[in-house]
Amino acid sequence: MDPSLVLEQTIQDVSNLPSEFRYLLEEIGSNDLKLIEEKKKYEQKESQIHKFIRQQGSIPKHPQEDGLDKEIKESLLKCQSLQREKCVLANTALFLIARHLNKLEKNIALLEEDGVLAPVEEDGDMDSAAEASRESSVVSNSSVKKRRAASSSGSVPPTLKKKKTSRTSKLQNEIDVSSREKSVTPVSPSIEKKIARTKEFKNSRNGKGQNGSPENEEEDKTLYCFCQRVSFGEMVACDGPNCKYEWFHYDCVNLKEPPKGTWYCPECKIEMEKNKLKRKRN
């Protein structure tokens, strides 16, 4: 593989990104303007009701209160819809970057393996956001099997670095794992399947575990979620049996807190609905 060809191909691949980003940002800006207008509408109607209550008291009902309430709810629903559209547009932009970046990183790795490109020497003292994002530590497939085996025997490993054992937490960089280690309540396999699983992925910059010894877990470079990036921060697992993404970043699926019960990603929900329709037709 020729580095010059890789560079040329990468430049060609990203040549349309500026126009694509311009369109996405214009759409987000347009939705922002619509949001402002809708907000003005429902705030105006709310002020009418509050003004009447201040003048007449809370006992008498505003003559147009039912109509105003209906219009306020419609405006709020419209705002919610616009916000969702903005999230989809923003995630689309993120996906475009992640896709091109992932392809570039794979090509760089191939060039390094072929010996035509010198590996990048990482400075242990460098404290940049780029380094932190590339060093995000995730669990390997072997650790998943170990955790499942422990769960079947009625116990759960105490460390939060095992996959699918932590309910909630935040991304942490350069911390002492022992100071943040939390206990986990044992969960039986039957109950575990019914719980929407969430996971925290930590990054230990110095590569040491609780006792200062090198970590035995291999770095998992598997790509998850719609954005096709590695695991980091707060993530939730899809309970769909055939989900091709498995894990999702909270921001990519518009989650702020762990879902209760089983949770399915948008694609699995659509697939489930299709299967229901097929069964009804048959």
Swiss-Prot record:
A single GO molecular-function term is:
methylated histone binding
CDD domains given in the database record: ING_ING3_Yng2p, PHD_ING
From the UniProt record, give one GO term of the biological process aspect: chromatin remodeling
Any one GO CC term of the record: nucleosome
ZnF endpoints (PHD-type): 222-271
Protein residues bound to Zn(2+) 2: C238, C243, C265, C268
Residue(s) carrying Phosphothreonine: T185
Q: Annotated site (Histone H3K4me3 binding), which positions?
A: Y224, M235, D239, W247
The UniProt entry, under PROSITE patterns, shows: ZF_PHD_1 (PS01359), ZF_PHD_2 (PS50016)
Coiled-coil annotated spans: 35-86
Q: Residue spans with biased composition (Basic and acidic residues)?
A: 191-203
* Signal peptide (residue range): none
Keyword hit for Coiled coil = yes
Q: Please give the start and end residues of each transmembrane region.
A: none
Q: Where is there biased composition of kind Polar residues?
A: 204-214
Q: Which Pfam families match?
A: ING, PHD
Binding residue positions for Zn(2+) 1: C225, C227, H249, C252
Q: Where is this region: Disordered?
A: 123-217
- What's the record's remark on domains? The PHD-type zinc finger mediates the binding to H3K4me3.
| PANTHER family noted in UniProt | CHROMATIN MODIFICATION-RELATED PROTEIN YNG2 (PTHR10333:SF100), INHIBITOR OF GROWTH PROTEIN (PTHR10333)
Q: Which family does it belong to?
A: Belongs to the ING family.
Question: What's this protein's name?
Answer: Chromatin modification-related protein YNG2
**Organism, as annotated:** Saccharomyces cerevisiae (strain ATCC 204508 / S288c) (Baker's yeast)
